[in-house]
Amino acid sequence: LAPGSKTVALYLKEAGLDENTVVIYMGDNGFAWGEHGLIDKRQFYEESVRVPMLIRSPKLIKGGQVLEKMVQNVDVAPTILACAGLDKAPQMVGYSFLPLLQGKDIPWRDRIFYEYYWEHEFPQTPTMHGVRTDRYKYIRYHGVWDTNEFYDLQEDPYETRNLIAAPQH
């Protein structure tokens, strides 16, 4: 964790606030470090789209859990509001995942969507759109790369076998 995390944790404890405070520590994106021959965050591979997140809230959430549901960045603000006992604004498109963290079986999304638009500063990375379910991922490229991709994440979690040309898929 970042060096300031310990300072914040110590302050909350000394002030008697640590048991009634929600602390969220997260990145803004994943990052590829050579997987798929790439180094960056601008692809729809698992290394780039899986974002690390830790949440501590002793009064609301049991510690030590790993949430396997597909959560998106748009879900963070509604979750923070729910932790404070507030409803999300009607224009917010995300959902609170607090009930999931509390072990409740609630209806949840079965797919996520991804989009990245070509940037002048990163001309080697094409515009792409994708959809991911618990099992499958489809990536459609525009421009630079000429082959779309389709993966069975259950059989190939590291996305090494592109099934786009496989007739059974």
Model-derived regions: residue spans:
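Long, internal low-complexity/basic segments
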Residues: 1, 81, 124, 155, ...
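Short, compositionally biased segments
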Residues: 1-11
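Histidine-centered active-site microenvironments of extracellular/periplasmic hydrolases
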Residues: 9-65, 72, 93, 118-123, ...
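Secondary-structure boundary motif
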Residues: 14-17, 103, 165
